Amino acid sequence: MHLLQLLFRASPATLLLVLCLQLGANKAQDNTRKIIIKDFDIPKSVRPNDEVTAVLAVQTELKECMVIKTYLISSVPLEGAFNYKYTACLCDENPKTFYWDFYTNRTVQIAAVVDVIRELGICPDDAAVIPIKNNRFYTTETLEVE
């Protein structure tokens, strides 16, 4: 009986070891892959009616491919290629870069939006996933007109 009591009695060293293992397991669970990584690049300032090129680079850390739709939204209406929407298959080994050329004569806030969508005929064999947690990602920049 005494041997059984020793076996079930937790020493401080054992408790410390279990605590460290638990903390390590929780930290490892925080290392999740990013669904969308985006880099939106526009000039900070331009002169009125100068051509502006907006560049959006998109990649993922997921192992599965996704169908994405990218587009721009502005605080004031802009014409031309600004309104183009791009649809593409995004995979971890194949990042995408999108370009928009437009003109403006007013200071404007611009949001680059990436939606993960369900659409057939974009990814090979229609093999694509849709994240449960988030399916819309965006970033905003301000374009100053001097």
UniProtKB/Swiss-Prot annotation:
One example GO MF annotation: aspartic-type endopeptidase activity
Signal peptide residue numbers: 1-28
Organism: Pongo pygmaeus (Bornean orangutan)
Gene3D superfamilies to which the protein is assigned, alphabetical: Immunoglobulins
Main localization, broad class: secreted
Keywords of the record: Disulfide bond, Glycoprotein, Pyrrolidone carboxylic acid, Secreted, Signal
Subcellular location: Secreted
Residues linked to a glycan: 105
Gene name in the database record: PIP
Modified residues (Pyrrolidone carboxylic acid): 29
Superkingdom to which the source organism belongs: Eukaryota
Similarity remark: Belongs to the PIP family.
Protein name: Prolactin-inducible protein homolog
PANTHER family reported for this sequence: PROLACTIN-INDUCIBLE PROTEIN (PTHR15096:SF5), PROLACTIN-INDUCIBLE PROTEIN/SEMINAL VESICLE ANTIGEN (PTHR15096)
Pfam entry (one): SVA
Cross-referenced InterPro entries: Ig-like_fold, Ig_E-set, PIP
SUPFAM superfamilies: E set domains
A Gene Ontology BP annotation from the UniProt entry: proteolysis
Gene Ontology CC entries for this record: extracellular space
SS bond list: 65-91, 89-123
Complexes and interactors: Monomer. Interacts with AZGP1.
